[in-house]
Amino acid sequence: MVKIAVCGAAGRMGGRIIAAVKEAEGVEICGALERPGHPMVGQDAGYNAGLGAIGVAISDDLNAVVQACDVLIDFTAPKVSLKNLEVCALYGKSIVIGSTGFTPEERALAAELAREIPVIIAPNMSVGVNVCFKVLADVAKILGEDFDVEIVESHHRLKKDSPSGTAVRMGEVVASALGRDYNKVANYHREGICGERTHDEIGMQTVRGGDIVGEHTVYFIGMGERIEITHRAHTRDMFSRGSVRAAKWVVTAKPGVYDMQDVLGLR
């Protein structure tokens, strides 16, 4: 039985992960974390998950929770995730990170810490999205240089980072397949008289509004034809189920940084 702890247990995603753990076989929820001073600290974690009491209180003691688990699932923010990763490395525990918005320096620090423990860092835990990553790489290689690439992503009005980590990953996948450096060809800004589109650039557009869970479309635009590859998320449950699947996988992995492509055997 894999013992799972959840960081951000009082949030929307944390609640869905706890519910997914309770539904899954071979795993159990052993800990729930929140920041010190959060009003739900001390309350049963099952209430936020819509389950009623499950006998696991939300705690603000990171060290104690990590020591008691086999793997920590973290959907918070980069700085919090890195702190959690440091503590997991200290105690030899695995971690699954779904936070987005990491800087290159933060990614480098995560890779350094992953020399001690297996770490999954994935901008999107959905099986469907990760299949899309595979499809995008294949399509980009087939189409080559004859099609322009544009990405449009849409999320709810409360999302803090832009563009989404999933959209950036899609851009990285396409750029790599085309032999380009994503950081050099990504275009996040078009306004006024900005000149014609360059051949290599990958455009990125963001929509924020309402309660959109997540939608990503990659356009391959040629002369006289267009291919659109779209993934739409209707609920957060696919992310929570994916994170539990990742947690079950990572506890048997060797130290290093992995993502959902590894979990799903898509490499």
UniProtKB/Swiss-Prot annotation:
Record gene name: dapB
Entry's Gene Ontology BP terms: diaminopimelate biosynthetic process; lysine biosynthetic process via diaminopimelate
Family, similarity comment: Belongs to the DapB family.
Record has Amino-acid biosynthesis as a keyword: yes
EC number(s) recorded for this UniProt protein: 1.17.1.8
Places the protein is found: Cytoplasm
Catalytic activity, as annotated: (S)-2,3,4,5-tetrahydrodipicolinate + NAD(+) + H2O = (2S,4S)-4-hydroxy-2,3,4,5-tetrahydrodipicolinate + NADH + H(+); (S)-2,3,4,5-tetrahydrodipicolinate + NADP(+) + H2O = (2S,4S)-4-hydroxy-2,3,4,5-tetrahydrodipicolinate + NADPH + H(+)
Top-level taxon: Bacteria
Lineage: Bacteria, Pseudomonadati, Thermodesulfobacteriota, Desulfuromonadia, Geobacterales
Positions with a binding annotation for NADP(+): R35
Function: Catalyzes the conversion of 4-hydroxy-tetrahydrodipicolinate (HTPA) to tetrahydrodipicolinate.
InterPro entries: DapB_C, DapB_N, DapB_N_CS, DHDPR_bac, NAD(P)-bd_dom_sf
Predominant subcellular localization, coarse grouping: cytoplasm
Pfam families xrefs: DapB_C, DapB_N
Name recorded for this polypeptide: 4-hydroxy-tetrahydrodipicolinate reductase
Organism: Citrifermentans bemidjiense (strain ATCC BAA-1014 / DSM 16622 / JCM 12645 / Bem)
Active site: H155, K159
GO cellular component labels: cytosol
Pathway(s) per entry: Amino-acid biosynthesis; L-lysine biosynthesis via DAP pathway; (S)-tetrahydrodipicolinate from L-aspartate: step 4/4
Cytoplasm found in the keyword field: yes
List of residues binding (S)-2,3,4,5-tetrahydrodipicolinate: H156, G165, T166
Keywords on record: Amino-acid biosynthesis, Cytoplasm, Diaminopimelate biosynthesis, Lysine biosynthesis, NAD, NADP, Oxidoreductase
EC category name: oxidoreductase
Alphabetized PROSITE patterns for the sequence: DAPB
